[in-house]
Amino acid sequence: MMPSQITRSSHSSLPEVAPASGDATGVSEQTPQQARTVAFFSSGELAVAFGRTSAAPEQDSVRLLSALQRELDKQHPSWHTVAQLCQSLAEVGTTEQGWHQLASEDQLPALRELLDRCTHRLADMPAAHASHDSLSQACEGLRTARLHQSVARLTARPSSLARAMADLLTLTHLDPETLGAEPPVISSYTLFSHFVRTAKQRTADLNDSLQRQPDAVVSLLRSHADTLNDLEMLPGALQALTENCQDAPARNELRELAEVAGALLQLLLEHDLLPRLEEISIEPGEAPAPGHEPAEPRLTTRQALLKVGGNLVRKFDAYGALAPMDDKALLALMRTPAPHLSPDQMHAFLNKHVLHLTQEQRDIVSNTPLPFAPEEDIEARYGMGFDEKLRLALANGSLVLSEEQLARLGDLPSAATTTSDVVQTLLEKPSSALSEAERDMLGAIVQANAQGQLDAWRAHNEQLPAVLSRSGLPSDVKDELLSLNKSMNAELGTLKNGASLKSRVLASPAMLLALAPLPLAVAFVSKDNSYSSSLVAHFTKNAVFMAGLMMNELTNARTNVDHGLNRYFVTVLANAIVAQPTFARNEHLLEQVGFGIATAVASGAATLGVFNRESIVAAFKLAKSKLSRQDTGNARIPQEDHLAVVKHFDVSEHFAQQMKVATELYKQDKSITDIMNSSLTYLGTKSSEFQARFEVADALRAGLQLAEGERKADPDFYTKLGLVALTASIGAALVMLMKSMVGKADYAADGVWCVSEMLKLAMNPEVDMQKAVQVFKEIVGLNLVMTGFLGVNKVWNFLDKGIKGYASGAAVLTAANLTLPGMVGEVAGAAAGKGLSYLTDKGKAAHQAGRAAASWAGDYVSTSRLGSAVGTLQTAIPGRIAGGQVVAGLYDRFRYLTWSHPAPAPQAAGEP
């Protein structure tokens, strides 16, 4: 289909249209509908048919919706006020700015909810009621605003299928008698005929798509079901337009459109997008009245149960033992060979998706020659070059885009970096709120960031030895960087090829069989029913995790080590310490305070040492470097070599950021296992360490002062910090509920360790909420369930009431441990995070007020005798004011910020 030459209501440019093209007398005698119809025939612009103008709105739609919501929430609303607000909202929808405001995702559910509320109130209100007319006017205003909203969203979509519905709705809102008017009111049918012909072609395409791919099209149209009710008037409107049309070609186009539209109405009825079959006739002249209730999306009982069940299983079984996960699709995309995309090329890749280039246009771009790329230009040599070809083809005139494509190209926000607006917008929306166009954009961004990344990143990492040979760095730093590089390549290899069958099948069963007996034996010999029931629940969950580990192809040695430490180490260590006195029946020793303290200290120290081994090793290295002369490497290397080395590490960080944004956006609409998420988190963390280690070493080599890098913003910081607070409270409560001294000491050490681990996750911006909840489930989950369980048992003591009571209690505890930790962790973390975020926002407001007061005081001081003294103090402490700004803005609303490359302080000596 040829691109339409009639300008649609795109976001880039909207026409300014006069109410009518006739003289002043004619205008004064026209109704608003006639004026809109005349303007539409004169311009051929869809938006004009709905009365849209370029005038600025007198009010803001967001404030109007809020005011309307508050008024309706009152016990006795003022229906006169409601009617005025609704009328104002309808008027805002006729302006260009208001048109776009109503089309936003935030206002879509709000407007529909208000319309439903008013419609139901009107249906319940007697016609003789004093407020009936006001409420009726309110409903009419809301329906008008809803119409503008729906048409704006339909025309904003790149798909011609959605625009077909907007074209047909336009024809139902014209005045047919205006076509029979004498010139000069209607001087030409050219634009009108072209509009009808385009609508016919789009409607035919929509019919074909409804027959071939009904699910996708129905999903696209379902949110507009209430507005589509106006199509019930379409047969009568087309008949009236045909009868009044004075142009023979235009009449033929209208008749052909009526046939295609009739088939469309039947298809819409079959898919429940129109409410009642008996009131829709495709015969000319039979136009049923509008006003039916909107058709809401419906799922069958079976579909609803399957959807709810799938979500619950995913929550309970994030390792993927039973739950259907979407790892395969993301892995397949990452494993697909494709060139690495630079930021500019990624933007162009998205252009290609959003512009919907025809095959002829793609061939033109593909055949456009590129200038010669130097060998050292990694991006130009290994990138796909679509961006450069697209620009060159447009510049030399070989590629001609339609008006719609140009509008999309101008409106497309850059998605080349993780901080781009389009990425942030998609990340901040829940999956259910994503529009069809946003889902298309999401898929394109995931593909651009993920496709071919595994091969490209590994190939890039293989160049590191050659790069380091030009770096001038000392040998110990090179070894450390090579070790980090090896760790990343090993993880990339697992993602590319999967883990060995041996590591998947043998490791987790061996851990369960070898490590579970000792704690269980200690618990049963000591006859501590509370403790033994908790271990039954703990190891049952380990068995479920074991199934997930064995079935997941990404279960490598690192995954098994993490699983063993998180699920076995603390339990086995604590029971190993108390095993000898337990089996020897030395109750006196077990109840001594000193033994309990010694057990807690030994267990806690060993646990913290094992889980913080890397930090401890790094601290020893730092201390050693401080005590001895440190080799900083060659301070003077060629500038060309230095630039090549810096380029290599920057590209490495770019790979990590691409992988992260692909994963985050993919998870907006899909589910991946905790195992895959852990693998990707590990890569991100190691990449950050890799980059940071190089920056420090390079600055020391050159004898420069390392500038403070910008901290990556962490959108999950407050929710993760909420999990830390929850972990601490659970540990304290559990210690209070334990009866024996050993139990108190054991859970005290366990609580300190859990808090330290959750705090490390909270402070790491590479760790997202899914990873934090995964660790919470593994190390705190049982403690969470035990707290409530032992609290109930403290009242009824059912665990000590025979085998039946013990078995029932253990079964309940096991079931709770399998299901609750993940959900409770997410909910509690989110709630605590909101509270912390609120307190921080209040703190920022107080900080701003304090700064304003300080500024006023500073103005006063600067004019007083103290001015010179204050100036001297500020000179002595140059970072005082800037430091406050850094603290206030440490965690803001931005999603991800890349580590800034250090800007070395200028020094004369040591320049490379």
Curated annotation (Swiss-Prot):
Domain of life: Bacteria
Intracellular or extracellular location(s): Secreted
Compositional bias (Polar residues): 1-13
Assigned GO CC terms: extracellular region
Record carries keyword Phosphoprotein: no
UniProt cross-references to Pfam families, sorted A to Z: HopW1-1 (PF15457)
Location of the region described as Disordered in the Swiss-Prot/TrEMBL record: 1-32
Keyword annotations: Secreted
Stated family: Belongs to the HopW family.
Protein name listed in UniProt: Effector protein hopAE1
Organism of this sequence: Pseudomonas savastanoi pv. phaseolicola (strain 1448A / Race 6) (Pseudomonas syringae pv. phaseolicola (strain 1448A / Race 6))
Gene encoding the protein: hopAE1
